[in-house]
């Protein structure tokens, strides 16, 4: 009997030592994370998935070919240095992005800085997977001709790493089946017809390496007056 009690006590002590609460996990992440160092593994690029979920189209200027858009930018990647044993601990935590390495993604045809509208927190899972999905307002330069027609206009937005070539960061569109207008405001003066995403690999005159980007094509048109009253 005493032996069984002793074994149970030892097991409880081991589990207590192995278990981590959220404060422990956050402390460990802050201690091990290196925000300035890209987390490549064995010379393989960091695989980054990105997609845009459009929330609203606020303004379209057909004279200057500019569009003002609000969207969620869903970005995922893996950083194995952040992983922990979740057997007796939470399997995910929210972490300020200032404590993490974050891909230096930029929209190549943006004409304003991204205005982040939500708390700058990322979800980190126990296997090291990171999801960052801020709500962003930003202006882009793109062809908006035809926005008043039935077929609408198609604005193309290119997003890729600003400094890392394809041997350091591999960028791919998120593969998922969802309604393109699922999150889009019903009160917008515009409506989404279609959204497509594709991957590009481009070599620029400045550099010998290829750079990857995700090209998001937003097909939209202005609603009829009767539809927005």
UniProtKB/Swiss-Prot annotation:
<dbReference type="InterPro" id="IPR007110">
    <property type="entry name" value="Ig-like_dom"/>
</dbReference>
<dbReference type="GO" id="GO:0045202">
    <property type="term" value="C:synapse"/>
</dbReference>
<dbReference type="GO" id="GO:0016020">
    <property type="term" value="C:membrane"/>
</dbReference>
<dbReference type="GO" id="GO:0004888">
    <property type="term" value="F:transmembrane signaling receptor activity"/>
</dbReference>
<keyword id="KW-0964">Secreted</keyword>
<feature type="glycosylation site" description="N-linked (GlcNAc...) asparagine">
    <location>
        <position position="85"/>
    </location>
</feature>
<dbReference type="InterPro" id="IPR006201">
    <property type="entry name" value="Neur_channel"/>
</dbReference>
<comment type="similarity">
    <text>To the extracellular portion of ligand-gated ionic channels family.</text>
</comment>
<protein>
    <recommendedName>
        <fullName>Acetylcholine-binding protein</fullName>
    </recommendedName>
</protein>
<dbReference type="Pfam" id="PF02931">
    <property type="entry name" value="Neur_chan_LBD"/>
</dbReference>
<keyword id="KW-1015">Disulfide bond</keyword>
<dbReference type="InterPro" id="IPR006202">
    <property type="entry name" value="Neur_chan_lig-bd"/>
</dbReference>
<dbReference type="GO" id="GO:0043083">
    <property type="term" value="C:synaptic cleft"/>
</dbReference>
<comment type="subunit">
    <text>Homopentamer.</text>
</comment>
<dbReference type="GO" id="GO:0005230">
    <property type="term" value="F:extracellular ligand-gated monoatomic ion channel activity"/>
</dbReference>
<feature type="signal peptide">
    <location>
        <begin position="1"/>
        <end position="19"/>
    </location>
</feature>
<feature type="domain" description="Ig-like">
    <location>
        <begin position="114"/>
        <end position="217"/>
    </location>
</feature>
<keyword id="KW-0325">Glycoprotein</keyword>
<keyword id="KW-0675">Receptor</keyword>
<comment type="function">
    <text>Binds to acetylcholine. Modulates neuronal synaptic transmission.</text>
</comment>
<keyword id="KW-0393">Immunoglobulin domain</keyword>
<dbReference type="InterPro" id="IPR036734">
    <property type="entry name" value="Neur_chan_lig-bd_sf"/>
</dbReference>
<keyword id="KW-0770">Synapse</keyword>
<feature type="disulfide bond">
    <location>
        <begin position="142"/>
        <end position="155"/>
    </location>
</feature>
<keyword id="KW-0732">Signal</keyword>
């Amino acid at each position: 009997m005493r032996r069984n009690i002793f074994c149970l006590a030892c097991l409880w002590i081991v589990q207590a030592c192995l278990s981590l609460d959220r404060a422990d996990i956050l402390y460990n992440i802050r201690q091990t994370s290196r925000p300035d160092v890209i987390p490549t593994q064995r010379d393989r690029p960091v695989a980054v998935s990105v997609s845009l979920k459009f929330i609203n189209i606020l303004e379209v200027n057909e004279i200057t070919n500019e569009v003002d858009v609000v969207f969620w930018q869903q970005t995922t990647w893996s950083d194995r240095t952040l992983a922990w044993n979740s057997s007796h601990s939470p399997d995910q935590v929210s972490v300020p992005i200032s404590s993490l390495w974050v891909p230096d993604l930029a929209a190549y045809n943006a004409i304003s800085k991204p205005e982040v509208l939500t708390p700058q927190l990322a979800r980190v899972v126990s296997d090291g997977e990171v999801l960052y999905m801020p709500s962003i307002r930003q202006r882009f330069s793109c062809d908006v001709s035809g926005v008043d027609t039935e077929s609408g206009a198609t604005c193309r937005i290119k997003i890729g790493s600003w400094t890392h070539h394809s041997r350091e960061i591999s960028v791919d569109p998120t593969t998922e089946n969802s309604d393109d207008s699922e999150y889009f405001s019903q009160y917008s003066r515009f409506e989404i017809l279609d959204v497509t995403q594709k991957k590009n690999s481009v070599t620029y005159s400045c550099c010998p390496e290829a750079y990857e980007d995700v090209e998001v094509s937003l097909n939209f048109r202005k609603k009829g007056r009767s539809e927005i009253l």
